[in-house]
């Protein structure tokens, strides 16, 4: 799997920014097929940092309706990546 297939986009949310500032933890939307070792290696290669720990959470797609037609959004996965002590936390606004 390609590095850019593993990491889809950074999640810039209120909780994610708070974790980035206090706990050196980054938040990403990742591929549903990616595992923790793939996420770790992708972050280390893309941002040139050392990763301490990866935690993942899987979310089911929500029901969405448009008029009389209904369907589901795709399932997705979120990854919290904690950096080792002494590593510079990348700012997504600079990238």
From Swiss-Prot:
One of its GO terms (cellular component) is ribosome. InterPro entries: Nucleotide-bd_a/b_plait_sf, Ribosomal_uL23-like, Ribosomal_uL23/eL15/eS24_sf, Ribosomal_uL23_CS. GO terms for biological process: translation. One of its GO terms (molecular function) is rRNA binding. Keywords: Ribonucleoprotein, Ribosomal protein, RNA-binding, rRNA-binding. SUPFAM superfamilies: Ribosomal proteins S24e, L23 and L15e. Part of the 50S ribosomal subunit. Contacts protein L29, and trigger factor when it is bound to the ribosome. PANTHER family: 60S RIBOSOMAL PROTEIN L23A. One of the early assembly proteins it binds 23S rRNA. One of the proteins that surrounds the polypeptide exit tunnel on the outside of the ribosome. Forms the main docking site for trigger factor binding to the ribosome. This is Large ribosomal subunit protein uL23. It comes from Solibacter usitatus (strain Ellin6076).
């Amino acid at each position: 799997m390609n590095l850019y297939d593993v990491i889809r986009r950074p999640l810039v949310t209120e909780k994610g920014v708070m974790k980035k500032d206090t706990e050196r933890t980054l938040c990403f939307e990742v591929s549903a097929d990616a595992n923790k070792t793939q996420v770790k290696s992708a972050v280390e290669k893309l941002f040139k940092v050392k990763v301490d720990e990866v935690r993942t959470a899987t979310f089911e797609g929500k029901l969405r309706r448009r008029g009389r037609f209904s369907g589901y959004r795709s399932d997705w996965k979120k990854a919290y990546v904690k950096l080792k002590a002494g590593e510079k936390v990348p700012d997504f606004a600079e990238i």
